[in-house]
């Protein structure tokens, strides 16, 4: 797999160009990452990211503008070090913690398992059931309930249910221990 110097893979990513070199992408930006849009008047939009310094140019087709009037009233924080997840909701002038739970983040086991990426993302897609395959095959391995895709192949989801089981699993004793997901 092709990746940049920060380890961000080209697959399902956005090319980031330096303002002085628009022929070859210098880095890759994560799909779904929240960025600051500085100028959208040309084919290449000028942006700033939270994880790299400076300004970057990105093809406009990869940028979904969010109006200044849009506010976020829900947030999810994933602690990859301590294997926890917290959900918050903005109510009035306060952010309320709605839940704090043990979680299992992504493990490094290429080519199928990837670490949970760090960053600030906007949810790209929601699925009641995310069907997954057995690694390296086209055989259905099971499903993960309540899946929200935030970047590339990264999802926040409920406890995976391996086939042939069909009923939901509410809790797993491995949650909050070590990175196990992919």
Which functions belong to the PLM regions below?
Residues 11-13, 44, 82-84:
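Exposed beta-strand and adjacent loop surfaces of beta-rich binding modules
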Residues 2-5, 162-178:
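Surface-exposed intrinsically disordered loops and tails
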Residues 148, 179-182:
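Active-site nucleophilic cysteine motif
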Residues 40, 59-167:
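Gly/Pro-biased beta-strand-loop elements
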Residues 26-64:
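SH3/SH3-like beta-barrel superfamily modules
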Residues 1-39:
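Beta-loop motif signature
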